[in-house]
Amino acid sequence: MEQQQDRRELDAKAREGETVVPGGTGGKSLDAQERLAEGRSRGGQTRKEQIGSEGYQEMGRKGGLSSAGGPGGERASEEGRPIDESKYRHP
């Protein structure tokens, strides 16, 4: 009974625009946020399987360098940081 009340409270917060589930940003209800979070997690896992663990790590390094000033690959080369794209395993 208490769990249903908790879910109702979380759903009310979600309907007000608050993110109540990590990874559920943009969902307009508790259920929508849960589905978004699950899909995003599954999507990341699928990508990791496609390009391999090392490629996934390199992709994260490259993405971490991206900014409003330009893509991560450009910034990495400007700073002299090597990004080894050969680690990307192509399906």
Curated annotation (Swiss-Prot):
GO terms for biological process: response to abscisic acid. Residues 1-18, 31-51, 75-91 have a biased composition (Basic and acidic residues). Residues 1-91 are annotated as: Disordered. One of its GO terms (cellular component) is cytosol. This is Em-like protein. Belongs to the small hydrophilic plant seed protein family. Pfam families: LEA_5. It comes from Picea glauca (White spruce). Residues 62-73 have a biased composition (Gly residues). Disulfide bonds: none annotated.
